[in-house]
Each structure stands twice: as structure tokens, then as C-alpha cells.
Amino acid sequence: MQNYYDQFDACREHDIPMCADACPFKIDILDLQERITKKRFNAAYKSIRDKVAFPAIVCEICPAYCEKACIRQIIDTPLQIRRLEKSVIELASRKSPNRYNLPAKHKKIAVIGAGLSGMGFAFRMASKKYDVTIFEKADRIGGQLSELLPEEAYMAEFDLQFTYENYNLKLNSEINDISPLCITEDNADGFDVIYVATGKGGNSFNVPFPGADSEDTRGCMSI
């Protein structure tokens, strides 16, 4: 890691650097670099986790858009940011999530699909103490992660980050129609929010969203 410290000092993009702008999660790369340079690996880990729900998973499958945007490549080679982030995860000694004593919220949230997107949204909502229920048609969570990582790796990360959060998980529960989940005059017990995360080739339930028919729209796993 010492090899990268000189590159940190040479970085002069003190506005929003191109690497951070290219990051889908908008990780503060300069802040991360500063913490790594000072060998504050626990603080660096927190910097990543503040933006990414499951750092150990995302750092393994990340396509590293930040490196493609790094202007260092004009001189020689881009900064190996993804490798540095993986090193932070390995070197951090305190990874336990923070525990917040927040009052429970009475809004109910349904998440359809227990892949990375669904689990990430469920985690963020559960951490805000919403009543979260995840519906997954398979007999396990993870979705397409099973094609990319060993099951024990991503399950360990899910377990770690959900340490202090509660959610309801319904496996073998395929949803073909979201109407029964919605609040109506005849169904006051429906969900206030429904998050559709059915993944590549999954059921969209004909829910429209801007840009869905664009040629530039791709599933996250196809990038």
C-alpha cells in the first residue's frame, strides 16, 4: 500500500474528482485516500460503508468505473482504487455496524427480490426502523450473487451488516401480482411502499419508470 501514498499526495482534484464523480455510490475518494494514508483503516472502512450497504460484496464485484475515470492514466496508470478498498476491508479491525436507538416507524415496506439491490434497500429501510418484509421466490437470498461469489462470502456480509436490524423474510414466495400488496379501500393492511428488485429477466409488473425503454438502460448485473 505504501506504493500508492505518493500518488495520493499528487492528486490535485480538490473539487469533485473525476473518479468520485464516476462512482455510482459517490464514495468520497479524497477522504478515503486521506484516511488510508494515515493508516486509519477503521475510519476508511466507515467511509466506504456510509455509501455502500455491503462493502465486502460490492468491492468484489465492482467494475471500478473510478479507475477508468482516473486522470492519473494520462501520466502512467490509474490509481488502483478498488484494490485499495479491498485492502481496507481486510485491514479494518472494527467492522461491526453502528447501533442506533431509533423509534420504530409504522410504515410497512415490501421488497420483492432478495438479490443485492433488494437486500441493500431492505437494509437501509430496516436501519431507519421501518417494518420491512422481503419476498423471495427462491429458497435462499442473494440472487445472481451466487454466480459471482461463494455463498458463504456474501451470506457472512449480509449477516454482519444486518446484525442490529430486523426484517421479515419470506422465501419460496413468488409474487406475480403486486395488487394484493397495495393499500386499497378493501385492503388496509397493505404495504405503504413496494420496492421491485426482481433482477435481470425478472417481473417488472409493468411498473413504468423514466428511461425504461432507453437503449442505454441495462440491468446492474449486465454492466
Where is each model-derived feature located?
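Iron-sulfur cluster-binding cysteine motifs and their immediate structural context
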Residues: 13-38, 60-88, 133, 137-140, ...
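Beta1-alpha1 glycine-rich phosphate/pyrophosphate-binding loop at the start
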Residues: 26-38, 43-46, 78-79, 111-172, ...
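Feature captures the FAD/FMN-dependent oxidoreductase FAD-binding
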Residues: 108-112, 159-204
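Short glycine-/acidic-enriched loop or helix-start segments at secondary-structure transitions
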Residues: 121, 144, 181, 205-207
